[in-house]
Amino acid sequence: MADTWVRMAGFYATGNAGSFFLPEIGDEVVVGFFDNDPRFPVILGSLYNGKNASPYTADAKNSIKAIVTKSLMKLEFNDEKKIITLVTPGNNTIIISDDAKSIEITDQNNNSIKLESGGITMNSPKDINIKATGNINMNATGKINVSATQDLALTGLNVAATAQVGFTGKGNATAEVSASGQTAIKGAMVMIN
């Protein structure tokens, strides 16, 4: 029998859009024929069998749906807990969970960003770098706390620190205010001890 081109049915197909899932070589497929004519076959779907088993085991709840590629990239839907999970073979993961009321992004290097009711948390075993070609603005209706177990450095063309009520600069060991030009200390009353 001569080779025949076979069309593939998809669950959605339209101009330059739709689903794109082709069976692998050697997969078991279900074939139909347009107008019952064997010259015009169409693949209707794929089947699991003893050689190609399902990546999941069915249960009575039937709450898990998934798309798993041959390289084990996975998109999983959990209808019971309302969770969507996207994961790569290297364990880069996105979890969107109504059950935990959170969104979490984790990579294979243990960097993570978590959005939940208590706020947003970023974690990294190494550095976190934030860059912008424009401005970076941070605003909080409460406090902003910046702390480091080692040095804390602020560098800019000009550095301005303004307090609406009080301003304290303190060094437990030493403190220095210096300039290569003029240095001015002003106040209604200046006390130097």
Placement of each model-derived feature along the sequence:
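Right-handed beta-helix
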Residues: 14-193
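Short, structured beta-strand/loop micro-motifs enriched in basic residues and often containing a Trp
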Residues: 4-15
